[in-house]
Amino acid sequence: MNLVPTVIEQSSQGERAYDIYSRLLKDRIIMVSGEVNDDMANAIIAQLLFLDAQDSEKDIYMYINSPGGSVSAGLAIYDTMNFVNADVQTIVMGMAASMASVLATAGTKGKRFALPNSEIMIHQPLGGAQGQSTEIQIAAEHILKTRKLINQILADGSGQDIETINKDTERDNFMTAQQAVDYGLIDGIMKNKKKIK
């Protein structure tokens, strides 16, 4: 069951009820939570485009708590983060794994954060194939191209060289918030809205 809380705001014109995500959107906050899939990507992309059209001079705040998911859906979000004119501040809370780690790193440099007890996990893309040998070969070539692309994005975002990224994504590589800062995936640890370590 997916329960979405409602908040009530009072103004001179009366009361207005919002679902919590709509209320957060008013403050330019986007929540990336759960598995990255096409439906989630479409919702995140629409919110990014809406907030950028509303005011491209103000930051967009993207809070991330996700195990990752679809590479194509994640890349659609990644491309939109880079497409919009507004700076996108990323804040990891809980976990940013797999494709979600790419999104955390894709925030505007200098504005990529994690809460103190967050984890970031990078690894190579996962995939499977079945069918005739030619289909399996095509799928294998595609996943190798995808790995090369994702690793280049991580290298560009972190400042690590591609050989280091290739080695470090060979297996699941879990990092604390501080390790992710040291690695270059994020820029700081956010203790609260005002205190950044």
UniProtKB/Swiss-Prot annotation:
Enzyme type, top EC level: hydrolase
A GO BP entry: protein quality control for misfolded or incompletely synthesized proteins
Catalytic activity: Hydrolysis of proteins to small peptides in the presence of ATP and magnesium. alpha-casein is the usual test substrate. In the absence of ATP, only oligopeptides shorter than five residues are hydrolyzed (such as succinyl-Leu-Tyr-|-NHMec, and Leu-Tyr-Leu-|-Tyr-Trp, in which cleavage of the -Tyr-|-Leu- and -Tyr-|-Trp bonds also occurs)
Protein's UniProt keywords contain Protease: yes
PROSITE patterns per UniProt: CLP_PROTEASE_HIS, CLP_PROTEASE_SER
Coiled coil: none
Record protein name field: ATP-dependent Clp protease proteolytic subunit
Protein's gene: clpP
